[in-house]
Amino acid sequence: VLSSVMIQGCIEKAESITRGGAKYNSSCWSAVGLIDLADSLSVIRQFVYDEKKTSMETLIDALKNDWQGHEALRKNGRFFGNNDEHTDELVNRLIADLDALANKRAPLRGGRFLFGCYIGYNSAHISMGLRTGATPNGRRRGDALTAGIIAEPGMDKNGLTSYLASAARLN
């Protein structure tokens, strides 16, 4: 309902956006947990392949055990929001790849999909997190996924300026 109030045509037609009230059709999709995905891929690359601090088997064991017994690895990687060019570029690549994938098909109402990084009033990141196991970026089983392009809580260790530099790199 809140979205319908903000969209031109819905009030005039007394219809929600889900029932054809919008004057202009657009379809969008949001990547809930995008930063969790990017940070997780960054950690796998950093610890398993580049620095060889752990094996993939050990990392999988840490995830199965919700990080218990593996605290030395948890939350010590390269994460989005710290002005880390590698991780920031990984986010850009994921955005481009996911956008290209979504646009292989047209929305039912025509046009093309608009990509969004889920910024809003919706709490999907919480409910999806409740159903998601531990992730390689240090997130525990059941914790909320990241909402939008914010850094995982506690991972933006270099302050606001570094977070803004990371966000400014995004396309």
Regions from the PLM with identified roles:
Residues 1-171:
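Acidic, glycine-enriched catalytic cores built around paired aspartates
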